[in-house]
Amino acid sequence: QTGQAHYESVKETARVALEKNERRYRYKPYGFLNPLALKMAAGAADLVISRAGSGSIAEISSWGKASILVPIPEDVSRDQRANAFAYAHAGATVVIEQGNLTPNLLLSEINRLFTNPKARIDLADSAKKFAKKDAARKLAEAIIETALEHEG
């Protein structure tokens, strides 16, 4: 998922970069995926590479997927770095800070996770444990309880 604004440039860059790759048909950029389509795409993935927004981490953990997170730099978004490292501390992801991100480093981490299935499975298992499956219900109950306490 590239975002609509970047879709055409990512599509063209991928076409050129993957032109001679026999697996190029497996790469499918999308400008936007609705929540159901995103969940279905994630279901087919063994590894998710994403930014580190709280919504992204919540989705990845609910899917129980191994991930590599690249947080937006702190000068742009202070919370993404903290989110990423909290998730990594739970054993659920690999973090590559944007300033350290190179194609070789990213490819090295991807290869490491695919040549070491146990590492990938451990990340996925930790992601499942991190997920708060009933968070929406608990939040709604807390809001209702607070509202009832202040009813007046």
Language-model features: locations:
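Donor-nucleotide binding loops and adjacent catalytic segments primarily
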Residues: 1-48, 81-85, 89, 96-105
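Short histidine/acidic/glycine/proline-rich micro-motifs that form metal-
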Residues: 5, 72-75, 129
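A donor-sugar binding/catalytic signature common to diverse glycosyltransferases
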Residues: 38-80
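Hydrophobic beta-strand scaffold residues
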Residues: 67, 94-95
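Receiver (REC) domain switch/output surface
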Residues: 109-113
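A short, well-ordered alpha-helix in the C-terminal region of glycosyltransferases
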Residues: 119-133
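C-terminal alpha-helical cap of glycosyltransferases
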Residues: 132-152
